[in-house]
C-alpha cells in the first residue's frame, strides 16, 4: 500500500529528482482483506510469503517497480532475514536460499542497471555479520541496534562495515517509541512494553540530556546523526507534526554543552 501511494505521488515527477529504497524478501499475492496483519493496520488485501531465492527476489522487485511506477530502484534491501524474524530453523533455510541464488540475482539486477545498491534491512546484528562473511554488501539498514539504549551493532559490525566500505543506515533510533516518548506509562521498547530496567535507563539519560539542553528525542536523534559509523538516519512517522518535530530536532543548533553530552555518549560505545 505504501508503495502504491508513493508511486502515485511520484509518477509524474522527474525520476532523477528523488531516491527510492524498497525491500525484497516477501512475495505478495492477492488475498482477503484483514484489519491487521503482522502488526500492520488495514494493509492492502494481499497474502505474503517469505522467499529469499533469486526467483523470489526478482518477483518481489518487479512487483515493487510496478507499484512505484518506476523501472529501477536506487537501494534494494533484503528484509528481515535472520533469527529475530524467522527463528533458528527457518532462518537457516532462508539464508541458504539467499546465499545460493538470491545474491546472484541481486548482482544481476545491479549489473543490469535495475538497482544502484543492495544490502540488508534487519533488526539484528548477527545475520549481518554472517552474510558479510560471504557477500560484499553496499549498505545495511540496521533497526534499533545502534541507539542510546542498544549498542549491539557497534564494535564487530561497525568495524566490518568500515573495513569493506559498507554504508550503515540507522533505523529504529527511538527503539520503537520509548526514546521519543520517555519513560511514561505504556511506553514501548522493541515493539513491546518497556521492562523496568529500560524505563530506569531512559529516566537517567533523559535527566542528563535535559541538563545539556536537549530533549530525550533530540538526544537520540543527534546521537545517531553524529555516530561515526552512521551514513544516514531513517525516520519513520505517521503524522505530519511528528515528522516536523524530528526534522527540527535534526536541524537543531547544537551548543557546546549538547555536543559534549553527545560525545560522552559516543565514547561509551
Language-model regions: role of each:
Residues 42-58, 90-92:
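Active-site mouth loops of central-metabolism enzymes
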Residues 15-18, 71-75, 117, 138-139, ...:
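Short acidic capping loops at alpha-helix termini that bridge into adjacent secondary structure
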Residues 3-16, 57-72, 154-167:
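Short amphipathic alpha-helices and their capping/turn segments at secondary-structure boundaries
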Residues 1-30, 39:
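N-terminal binding-site loop/beta-alpha segment at the start of enzyme catalytic domains
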Residues 65-88:
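Active-site groove signature of glycoside hydrolases
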Residues 30-40, 183-187:
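Short, flexible, mixed-charge acidic loops at enzyme active sites
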Residues 9, 81-269:
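Beta/alpha (TIM)-barrel catalytic core signal, keyed to glycine-rich beta->alpha loops juxtaposed to Asp/Glu
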Residues 53-67, 123-130:
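Short, acidic/polar
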Amino acid at each position: 500500500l505504501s508503495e502504491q501511494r508513493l508511486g502515485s505521488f511520484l509518477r509524474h515527477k522527474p525520476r532523477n529528482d528523488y531516491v527510492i529504497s524498497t525491500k525484497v524478501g516477501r512475495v505478495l499475492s492477492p488475498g482477503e482483506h484483514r484489519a491487521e496483519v503482522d502488526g500492520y493496520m488495514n494493509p492492502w488485501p494481499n497474502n505474503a510469503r517469505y522467499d529469499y531465492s533469486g526467483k523470489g527476489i526478482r518477483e518481489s522487485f518487479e512487483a515493487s517497480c510496478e507499484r512505484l511506477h518506476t523501472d529501477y530502484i536506487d537501494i534494494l534491501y533484503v528484509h528481515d532475514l535472520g533469527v529475530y524474524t524467522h527463528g533458528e530453523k527457518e532462518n537457516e533455510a532462508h539464508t541458504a536460499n539467499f546465499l545460493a541464488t538470491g545474491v546472484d540475482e541481486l548482482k544481476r539486477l545491479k549489473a543490469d542497471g535495475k538497482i544502484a545498491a543492495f544490502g540488508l534491512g534487519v533488526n539484528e546484528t548477527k545475520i549481518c555479520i554472517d552474510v558479510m562473511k560471504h557477500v560484499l554488501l553496499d549498505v545495511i539498514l540496521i533497526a534499533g541496534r545502534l541507539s542510546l539504549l542498544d549498542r549491539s551493532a557497534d564494535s564487530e559490525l561497525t568495524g566490518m562495515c568500515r573495513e569493506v566500505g559498507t554504508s550503515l543506515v540507522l533505523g529504529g533510533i527511538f527503539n520503537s517509541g520509548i526514546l521519543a516518548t520517555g519513560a511514561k506509562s505504556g511506553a514501548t521498547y522493541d515493539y513491546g512494553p518497556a521492562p523496568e530496567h529500560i524505563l530506569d535507563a531512559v529516566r537517567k539519560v533523559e535527566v542528563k540530556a535535559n541538563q545539556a539542553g536537549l530533549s530525550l528525542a533530540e538526544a537520540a536523534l543527534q546521537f545517531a546523526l553524529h555516530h561515526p559509523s552512521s551514513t544516514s538516519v531513517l525516520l519513520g512517522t505517521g503524522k505530519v507534526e511528528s515528522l516536523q518535530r524530528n526534522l527540527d530536532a535534526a536541524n537543531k543548533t547544537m551548543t557546546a554543552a549538547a555536543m559534549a553530552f553527545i560525545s560522552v555518549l559516543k565514547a561509551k560505545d
